[in-house]
């Protein structure tokens, strides 16, 4: 029998659990902040106390009706509710040990990533077409709904698709493999198609509001950079493109920090055409430059192997050694290579 997967809204959790989740913005009213000002913050896209506490003062001043004195008071009250000072490495280590990892569907790939895709940070998948980026995203959208003891994140998935490659049929095939109810799995995936870079950013404001209402474990953006290649062209617009991209990635990082979701973005590659390319073993590099390199916590390079096998290499990570693993793309999602 297919297992049912349903998640309760995070807002009506017990007081004990609430200390771990983000604080709803309404908490500021209890701290003496005017209800109208709280409403203005919410309309501007701030749905949690954390999002306000982490925001620079000039961002709050851009909100109509928020004066400098009000901004100072709001930030002071938010800082009291959100710990933002120094902590010992021991405490931080303890918090890190509680981080959930979401299985990729392949034992070899999970071993390479020391458990799976990490929540609370950005993982970037880049590679040529047909290397398994989108297939891995589809598999993760289902595995994140599994119970924690089965390698899941016990939460919903959010999928922002900029290339029109999302296929619900793939999710149903993966759900069947894990014995989950297909209709529940589809209900737990919030899907949006991104049409341009401004719309792509706007969707993150909606994502923030939805995450404040319900428990999400994963946010996928496939692909994070495709629309930037078409909306901005030529060297003349490079600076504007990188600034817009940096702002988008900063918002993703905030969502990962605030809600503890795993953020997975896919990226395309570009062929190097400079002199150094002649001596490089693989003359392809991910697009987005240093901006995306610094924003991603873990960068995974996917390339084709023989037949349906693919190879994943850790390109950059603060804690994982540089290594490779083989995986396969099967009818029921990402799995282990038969070889």
From Swiss-Prot:
Subcellular localization, as worded in the UniProt entry: Nucleus; Cytoplasm; Chromosome
A GO term for molecular function: identical protein binding
Chain spans, region Disordered: 1-23
Residue span, HhH domain: 48-77
Keywords carried by this UniProt record: ATP-binding, Chromosome, Cytoplasm, DNA-binding, Nucleotide-binding, Nucleus
Keyword Manganese: no
Binding residue positions for ATP: 127-134
GO cellular component: a single term: presynaptic intermediate filament cytoskeleton
Coiled-coil segments on the chain, per record: none
Biological process terms in GO annotation: cellular response to camptothecin; cellular response to hydroxyurea; cellular response to ionizing radiation; chromosome organization involved in meiotic cell cycle; DNA damage response; DNA recombinase assembly; DNA repair; DNA strand invasion
Pfam families: HHH_5, Rad51
Tissue expression per record: Expressed at high levels in lymphoid and reproductive organs.
Signal peptide: none
Assembly information from the UniProt record: Forms linear homooligomers, giving rise to a RAD51 nucleoprotein filament, which is essential for strand-pairing reactions during DNA recombination.
Family membership noted in the UniProt record: Belongs to the RecA family. RAD51 subfamily.
Known role: Plays an important role in homologous strand exchange, a key step in DNA repair through homologous recombination (HR). Binds to single-stranded DNA in an ATP-dependent manner to form nucleoprotein filaments which are essential for the homology search and strand exchange. Catalyzes the recognition of homology and strand exchange between homologous DNA partners to form a joint molecule between a processed DNA break and the repair template. Recruited to resolve stalled replication forks during replication stress. Also involved in interstrand cross-link repair.
NCBIfam families in UniProt: PRK04301.1, recomb_RAD51
Protein's UniProt name: DNA repair protein RAD51 homolog 1
Natural source organism: Gallus gallus (Chicken)
């Amino acid at each position: 029998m297919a297992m049912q997967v349903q998640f309760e809204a995070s807002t009506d959790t017990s007081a004990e659990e609430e200390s771990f989740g983000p604080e709803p913005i309404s908490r500021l009213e209890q701290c003496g902040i005017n209800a109208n000002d709280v409403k203005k913050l919410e309309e501007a896209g701030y749905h949690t106390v954390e999002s306000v506490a982490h925001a620079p003062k000039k961002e709050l001043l851009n909100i109509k009706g928020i004066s400098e004195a009000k901004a100072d008071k709001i930030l002071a009250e938010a800082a009291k509710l959100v710990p933002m000072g120094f902590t010992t490495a021991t405490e931080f280590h303890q918090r890190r040990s509680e981080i959930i990892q979401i299985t990729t569907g392949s034992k070899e790939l999970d071993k390479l990533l020391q458990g799976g895709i990490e929540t609370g940070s950005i993982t970037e998948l880049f590679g040529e077409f047909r290397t398994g980026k989108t297939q891995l995203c589809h598999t993760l959208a289902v595995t994140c709904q599994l119970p924690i003891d089965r390698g899941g994140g016990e939460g919903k998935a959010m999928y922002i698709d900029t290339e029109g490659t999302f296929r619900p049929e793939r999710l149903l095939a993966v759900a069947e493999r894990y014995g989950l109810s297909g209709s529940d799995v589809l209900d737990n995936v919030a899907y949006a198609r991104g049409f341009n870079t401004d719309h792509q950013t706007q969707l993150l404001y909606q994502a923030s509001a939805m995450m404040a209402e319900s428990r999400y474990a994963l946010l996928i953006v496939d692909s994070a950079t495709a629309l930037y290649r078409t909306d901005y062209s030529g060297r003349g617009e490079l600076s504007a493109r990188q600034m817009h991209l940096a702002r988008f990635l900063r918002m993703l990082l905030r969502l990962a920090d605030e809600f503890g979701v795993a953020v997975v973005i896919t990226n395309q590659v570009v062929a190097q055409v400079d002199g150094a390319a002649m001596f490089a073993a693989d003359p392809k590099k991910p697009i987005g430059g240093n901006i995306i390199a610094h924003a991603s916590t873990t960068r995974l390079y996917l390339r084709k192997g023989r037949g349906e096998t693919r190879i994943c290499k850790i390109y950059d990570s603060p804690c994982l050694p540089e290594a490779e693993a083989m995986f396969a793309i099967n009818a029921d999602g990402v799995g282990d290579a038969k070889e």
